[in-house]
């Protein structure tokens, strides 16, 4: 299978070729701890843990730049035909979290330099950085260790170094960018059963008018790969 992106690393940076067919598709961006020099860090994280939930993102571009969008997944308005919807939309535009200069463009793809994006902490994604930083960052220690590209995901191992208050702190973070299916999974309302984590959402209703709070359970979409569907249906 063809990789999701094509990566080229050299002395000038880490260049990512992104197919235009993936523009405006939904992605999840996440980061977890691979190694730490000590678990006695500011947020008390161990290897294998993450601090933040994965973040929903989209990509878009114009003639000069590629943009990373952070849609709001917790405030919804489903009735787009209502007369009041334009007023809601004016107060719910999608913010831009990152932008990059387009280094090269073809009919089917664009190329950007993601060196800084991949090798530095991303606010609200990386477990160490900003308010959760173990100490003063040591940029000379921040570097990309490994990049793996698959059909539907990008996996990057990154090293971060910090001065620390009493001793130096070194960590390796695994950043993941996952391409989501074009057809979203059917959500399920949370109930009182034990064992489910849930995500709160607010739904705007113009007819009432009101704002309804709803909780949806978090669950995994576990389905067979296309090549294994027949075996799955046969119970193998």
Describe the role of every protein-language-model region.
Residues 1-236:
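Auxiliary tRNA-acceptor-end handling modules of aminoacyl-tRNA synthetases
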């Amino acid at each position: 299978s063809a990789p999701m992106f094509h990566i080229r690393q050299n002395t000038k940076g880490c260049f990512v070729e992104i197919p235009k067919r993936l523009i405006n598709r939904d992605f999840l961006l996440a980061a977890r701890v691979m190694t730490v020099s000590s678990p006695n860090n500011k947020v008390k994280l161990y290897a294998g843990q993450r601090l933040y939930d994965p973040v929903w993102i989209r990509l878009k571009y114009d003639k000069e730049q590629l943009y990373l969008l952070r849609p709001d997944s917790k405030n919804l308005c489903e009735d787009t035909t209502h007369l009041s919807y334009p007023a809601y939309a004016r107060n719910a535009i999608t913010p831009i979290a990152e932008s990059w200069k387009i280094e090269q463009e073809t009919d089917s793809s664009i190329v950007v330099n993601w060196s800084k994006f991949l090798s530095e902490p991303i606010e609200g994604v990386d477990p160490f950085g900003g308010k959760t930083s173990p100490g003063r960052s040591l940029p000379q220690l921040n570097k990309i260790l490994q990049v793996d590209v698959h059909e539907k995901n990008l996996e990057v191992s990154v090293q971060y170094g910090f001065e620390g208050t009493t001793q130096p702190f070194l960590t390796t973070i695994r950043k993941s960018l996952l391409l989501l299916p074009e057809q979203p999974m059917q959500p399920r309302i949370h109930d009182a059963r034990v064992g489910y984590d849930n995500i709160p959402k607010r739904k705007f209703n113009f007819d009432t008018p009101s704002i309804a709070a709803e909780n949806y359970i978090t669950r995994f979409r576990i389905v067979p790969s296309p090549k294994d569907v027949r075996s799955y249906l046969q119970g193998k």
